Regions:
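Disordered, acidic Ser/Thr/Pro-rich linker "stalks" and the adjacent N-terminal cap
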Residues: 1-29, 45, 120-166
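Beta-sandwich interaction modules
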Residues: 28-31, 71-110
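Predominantly extracellular/luminal cell-surface or secreted proteins
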Residues: 40, 55-59, 117
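A short beta-strand element within beta-rich, extracytoplasmic domains
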Residues: 32-46, 101-103
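Short, surface-exposed beta-strand/strand-loop-strand elements in extracellular ectodomains
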Residues: 45-60
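Intrinsic, low-complexity N-terminal interaction/targeting segments
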Residues: 2-15, 63-91, 161-166
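Short, structured interface segments
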Residues: 111-122
Length: 166
C-alpha cells in the first residue's frame, strides 16, 4: 500500500463524483495507421471502467499540453463497454496516419495496459542518410515465411542488436 491506498501495476483514477470522464494521451512510438487497440483491465475486477473510447490525432513534433487540447481528435473506437480483468480488444477501421491517441475511460477506473497495434508509417522528412528500409520502426513488415517453429521472423527486423540465442 502507498500513501494513496493500494498500489496497482496500471493506471487507476480516483472515483469521479462529478460529471465527465478521465483520459490519458499517448504519443505513439512511431506514427502509423492504427488497426486495433487493446484496453487490458487485468487484475482490475471491481474498479475497471465500464466504458471506454479511443480518439486519434496527427500532430508533428512534440506538442505541449495546450497544443494537445487544441488538436482535432477523430474517434477511432466509439464509446463502448469494457469488462474487468480482461484484455478488451477493439478493431479500428481507419487508413489515416496518426501520431497520438487518447484513451477515455467512463467515468473512471483502472487500466493495466493500453496497446495500440498497426502499421508504422514514418515521415520521410525526418529520415536522413542511409535508412534501413526493412526495419520494423521504419514501416518494414514480414509478410510470410516458410517456418516459425523456433521463433517469429519478425525478430529479423526488430530494432537493436540481438541479445541472445534464447
Amino acid at each position: 500500500f502507498g500513501n494513496k491506498g493500494k498500489v496497482y501495476d496500471g493506471w487507476e483514477t480516483r472515483r469521479r463524483r462529478s460529471p465527465g470522464h478521465d483520459h490519458a494521451i499517448v504519443r505513439l512510438g512511431a506514427p502509423g495507421v492504427v488497426r486495433g487497440v487493446v484496453v487490458d483491465t487485468a487484475f482490475f475486477r471491481g474498479n475497471y471502467p465500464p466504458q471506454v473510447s479511443v480518439e486519434a490525432t496527427s500532430i508533428e513534433g512534440y506538442p505541449s499540453p495546450d497544443d494537445m487540447a487544441d488538436a482535432v481528435w477523430q474517434t477511432i473506437v466509439a464509446e463502448t463497454p469494457a469488462e474487468g480483468d480482461t484484455a478488451n480488444r477493439y478493431a479500428v477501421a481507419s487508413d489515416r496516419r496518426w501520431t497520438h491517441v487518447r484513451l477515455s475511460i467512463y467515468p473512471d477506473g483502472g487500466v493495466a495496459r493500453f496497446r495500440v497495434h498497426g502499421d508504422v508509417v514514418p515521415d520521410p522528412r525526418h529520415l536522413e542518410g542511409t535508412v534501413d528500409v526493412a526495419a520494423l520502426e521504419n514501416g518494414g513488415a514480414v509478410v510470410d515465411c516458410s517456418d516459425r517453429f523456433y521463433s517469429s521472423p519478425v525478430n529479423l527486423i526488430l530494432p537493436g542488436r540481438a541479445r541472445s540465442m534464447g
